[in-house]
Amino acid sequence: MADVMRVAVAGASGYAGGEILRLLLGHPAYAQGRLTIGAVTAAASAGSPLGEHHPHLTPLAQRVLEPTDAAVLAGHDVVFLALPHGHSAALADQLGADTLIVDCGADFRLTDAAAWERFYGAPHAGSWPYGLPELPGARERLRGARRIAVPGCYPTAALLALLPAMAEDLIEPAVTVVAVSGTSGAGRAAKTDLLGSEVIGSARAYNIAGAHRHTPEIAQGLAAVSGRDVTVSFTPVLIPTSRGILATCTARTTAPLSALRAAYEKTYDAEPFIYLMPEGQLPRTGAVIGSNAAHIAVAVDEAAGVLVAIAAIDNLVKGTAGAAVQSMNLALGWPETQGLSVIGVAP
């Protein structure tokens, strides 16, 4: 391992790329000179100062965005790819095997080629170790890895909400997920339906009835921990806020709340970024904004025989950039909590 890790961020003009840079600037390795920020790249925005896109990143404001190509990214020890799906695979193929590549896009998340091709309409590029350390066995796969696929934001919330119950076989393998999200999850590209006048004061479901691309990713993660095929009904809802996901997940159960809470406590007791809320308290997105934390609550609707598991995360931190930095830390043999906070910004 190099004495000083040189890090590049591709897609630095976008929300995820900017959030990765924010976290790197606060990383102790950056403060100690063990990590330096090299190339910051973009596509259409190449040639413009980073500060035009992220004025809050004042230490890097005068950096000029370079084109996103392999020649610019070569020579870095770590490369974060914060690119639209379909763009990461070609770049990754051109970078050295010793380069740690952390992909925040969808290209390498799914193990099922048919599912990838159905939902993304392109050939499957393969799969990489999945960057959700809280999943069973994930840390072992991430330590020393040189290729990492960061999970999608919705799957992160849904998997963290359901993992303990599914792993302990306390719920049926058919789950319903209704998740509300802020608009930053849709990216920074200009879109009519994301204009302020369209979003403010309105909530809107989209890609319903199994159409959302995160549906097979949620099913894949739950199947991996349960050893069973799992069906997922997923409804995403856009709400008028910039950040945050609140996922409400339900599944049939005959287990009492005491058994369910015991499973969640056993699973998450030692997890640094998971906060299992006391009975009677419920997660809210405002409590996790800016942090890598996930706040989780569980309850049982006894009349319906249903587990209700709720998770709140910041979609740009635990849902993307925070998971990327957490995975980088593990891959480099650093404490996984470095540069990441469990403390949100409120109100």
Curated annotation (Swiss-Prot):
GO molecular function term, any single one: NAD binding
One cellular component (GO) term of this entry: cytoplasm
Alphabetic keyword roster: Amino-acid biosynthesis, Arginine biosynthesis, Cytoplasm, NADP, Oxidoreductase
Location of the protein in the cell: Cytoplasm
Catalytic residue list: 153
Annotated pathway: Amino-acid biosynthesis; L-arginine biosynthesis; N(2)-acetyl-L-ornithine from L-glutamate: step 3/4
EC assignment: 1.2.1.38
Family (UniProt): Belongs to the NAGSA dehydrogenase family. Type 1 subfamily.
Protein name: N-acetyl-gamma-glutamyl-phosphate reductase
Gene source species: Mycobacterium avium (strain 104)
Taxonomy of the source species: Bacteria, Bacillati, Actinomycetota, Actinomycetes, Mycobacteriales
